[in-house]
């Protein structure tokens, strides 16, 4: 019996699951809206909500805990400088999940997970990985 076990396994090892949620939470912080499968979105929401709660309390300890979770310094900086102050007065419920139909290839239920009161201009700015020299030149 599986009573009392929280979360889904997604046919992945623990390390793979943790890395997947770290990457997905970094992508959500970066773009403030991502499209994924519905079960992944449902399991991603508590991870991101805890990160936003960390972002509301700007301390060295909270920054280290966030860095251990998402492993991207730029996204940690955005978490504490943009998202934390934005949701300072909101006691919880920072994300919303909207169903988005079914994927064509395997009919998997899809969902859009986004921040409540998100910045609509944050979406679509990613052009892939860039080198440090081109980022400093711009």
UniProtKB/Swiss-Prot annotation:
Sequence similarity: Belongs to the bacterial ribosomal protein bL17 family.
GO MF, one annotated term: structural constituent of ribosome
InterPro entries the record matches: Ribosomal_bL17, Ribosomal_bL17_sf
GO biological process: translation
Protein encoded by which gene: rplQ
Keywords: Ribonucleoprotein, Ribosomal protein
GO terms under cellular component: cytosolic large ribosomal subunit
Protein name, UniProt field: Large ribosomal subunit protein bL17
PANTHER family attached to this UniProt entry: LARGE RIBOSOMAL SUBUNIT PROTEIN BL17M, RIBOSOMAL PROTEIN L17
Organism: Methylorubrum extorquens (strain CM4 / NCIMB 13688)
Subunit structure: Part of the 50S ribosomal subunit. Contacts protein L32.
């Amino acid at each position: 019996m599986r009573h009392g076990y929280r979360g889904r396994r997604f046919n992945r090892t623990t390390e793979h699951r943790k890395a997947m949620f770290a990457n997905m939470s970094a992508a959500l912080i970066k773009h403030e809206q991502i499209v994924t499968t519905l079960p992944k979105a449902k399991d991603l929401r508590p991870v991101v909500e805890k990160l936003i709660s960390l972002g509301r309390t700007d301390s060295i300890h909270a920054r280290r805990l966030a860095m251990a979770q998402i492993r991207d310094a730029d996204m940690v900086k955005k978490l504490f400088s943009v998202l934390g102050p934005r949701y300072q007065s909101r006691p919880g419920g920072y994300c919303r999940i909207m169903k988005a139909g079914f994927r064509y290839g395997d009919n998997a239920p899809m969902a859009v997970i986004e921040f409540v009161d998100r910045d609509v201009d944050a979406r679509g700015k990613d052009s892939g990985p860039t080198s440090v020299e081109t980022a400093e030149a711009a």
